[in-house]
């Protein structure tokens, strides 16, 4: 079974489900939702219209449960001056076996997420891709082809 995103350009080619046993990068448009916890903001993704063939809905992922592995790295984006209310696009590395099993994607799998841009659609994010290491304020700008 292949799970293919309904996006365009290089995203479609890069986001296809590979052979079993390998990992895949998935791209989905999400809106950043934030809430204040103490002196800092906690943000997560609110998925919409992320349709995939043969896969669970993206709406099942990234619930507002507070600081956890699946919460977007706010410290890194605050360093770059990103407005917390802007939409952004992320690509996350997941295990395709879980997709095939229909179990969905547990939050702990979202450990290799790449921040792409503040644009609404993923094919608009080709010009800018920033990788933010976990627990680090230093973001490394990388070429779009290296994002996935």
Curated annotation (Swiss-Prot):
Q: Where is the signal peptide?
A: 1-35
Subcellular location per the Swiss-Prot or TrEMBL entry: Secreted
Keywords from the UniProt entry: Secreted, Signal
**What top-level branch of life does the organism fall under?**
Eukaryota
Q: What is its main location?
A: secreted
One GO cellular-component annotation of the UniProt record comes to:
extracellular region
State the name under which the record lists this protein. Putative uncharacterized protein FLJ46089
């Amino acid at each position: 079974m292949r799970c293919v995103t309904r996006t365009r350009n290089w995203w479609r080619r890069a986001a296809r489900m590979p052979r079993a046993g390998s990992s895949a990068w998935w791209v989905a448009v999400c809106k950043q939702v934030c809430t204040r916890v103490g002196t800092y903001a906690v943000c997560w993704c609110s998925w919409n219209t992320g349709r995939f063939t043969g896969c669970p809905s993206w709406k099942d992922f990234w619930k507002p449960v507070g600081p956890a592995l699946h919460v977007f790295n706010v410290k890194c984006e605050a360093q770059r001056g990103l407005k917390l209310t802007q939409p952004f696009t992320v690509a996350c590395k997941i295990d395709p076996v879980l997709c095939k099993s229909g179990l969905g994607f547990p939050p702990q799998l979202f450990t290799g997420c790449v921040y792409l841009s503040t644009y609404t659609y993923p094919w608009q994010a080709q010009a800018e891709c920033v990788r933010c290491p976990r627990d680090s304020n230093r973001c490394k700008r990388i070429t779009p082809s290296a994002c996935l």
